[in-house]
Amino acid sequence: MSELSIYSEQGGEPVFSTLDSARIQHELSLRGIAFDRCASKAEIALDADQADILSTYAEEIHRIQALGDYPTVDAIRMKPDHPDRQALRQKFLSEHTHAEDEVRLFVEGRGLFCLHIKSEVLQVTCETNDWISVPAGTRHWFDMGEKPYFCAIRFFNNPNGWVANFTNDPIAERFSKLRD
């Protein structure tokens, strides 16, 4: 289930938490973050490749592309046995920004986006059928968990794909990670 928890940037207990997707959408929109749910699709086959995944979600991809300038789309799929899972997790766990929006449609599993906005940290657990759009320049990090299980369609306006500018702020170390 999707979840939003809002913390002071100092850490500690959340000052707000909800599992209600309408409240999640509202609270995020107040902070310039787009969040929505897409219609459910059939489960993705274990042997599905990127082309199969993108074809299955073509309608949603076109709808999201129409919301912004996202000509490049790909799919990333992580499973607990992925050989590079620990290295990739560590890379995404460091606070960073992008020169472009970070837009993700989760089509399988879940992941945790942590958004550092002003004096707050918002932890958004995204589940299957959630999409989130984090505006360019937003300080954030992402946790896929120790045993990652997710597939997300990624939307880019930069043909080079995922390009991070790391802040070197250790803030992510003060906050909880995705619970497996």
UniProtKB/Swiss-Prot annotation:
Metal-binding in keyword set: yes
Protein name, entry field: Acireductone dioxygenase
Cofactor details (free text): Binds 1 Fe(2+) cation per monomer.
Function: Catalyzes 2 different reactions between oxygen and the acireductone 1,2-dihydroxy-3-keto-5-methylthiopentene (DHK-MTPene) depending upon the metal bound in the active site. Fe-containing acireductone dioxygenase (Fe-ARD) produces formate and 2-keto-4-methylthiobutyrate (KMTB), the alpha-ketoacid precursor of methionine in the methionine recycle pathway. Ni-containing acireductone dioxygenase (Ni-ARD) produces methylthiopropionate, carbon monoxide and formate, and does not lie on the methionine recycle pathway.
Pfam annotation, one family: ARD
Disulfide bonds: none
Family assignment from sequence similarity: Belongs to the acireductone dioxygenase (ARD) family.
The EC number(s) this enzyme carries: 1.13.11.54, 1.13.11.53
Pathway connected to this protein: Amino-acid biosynthesis; L-methionine biosynthesis via salvage pathway; L-methionine from S-methyl-5-thio-alpha-D-ribose 1-phosphate: step 5/6
InterPro entries to which the protein is assigned, alphabetical: ARD, ARD_bac, RmlC-like_jellyroll, RmlC_Cupin_sf
Sites where the protein binds Ni(2+): 96, 98, 102, 140
Residues that hold Fe(2+) according to the record: 96, 98, 102, 140
Catalytic activity: 1,2-dihydroxy-5-(methylsulfanyl)pent-1-en-3-one + O2 = 3-(methylsulfanyl)propanoate + CO + formate + 2 H(+); 1,2-dihydroxy-5-(methylsulfanyl)pent-1-en-3-one + O2 = 4-methylsulfanyl-2-oxobutanoate + formate + 2 H(+)
Enzyme class: oxidoreductase
GO biological process, one term: L-methionine salvage from methylthioadenosine
Record keyword Metal-binding present: yes
Residues the UniProt record annotates as site (Important to generate the dianion): 104
GO function term, MF aspect, one: nickel cation binding
Organism field: Synechococcus sp. (strain WH7803)
Top-level taxon in the UniProt lineage: Bacteria
Named cofactor requirement(s): Fe(2+); Ni(2+)
Transmembrane segments: none
Swiss-Prot/TrEMBL keywords: Amino-acid biosynthesis, Dioxygenase, Iron, Metal-binding, Methionine biosynthesis, Nickel, Oxidoreductase
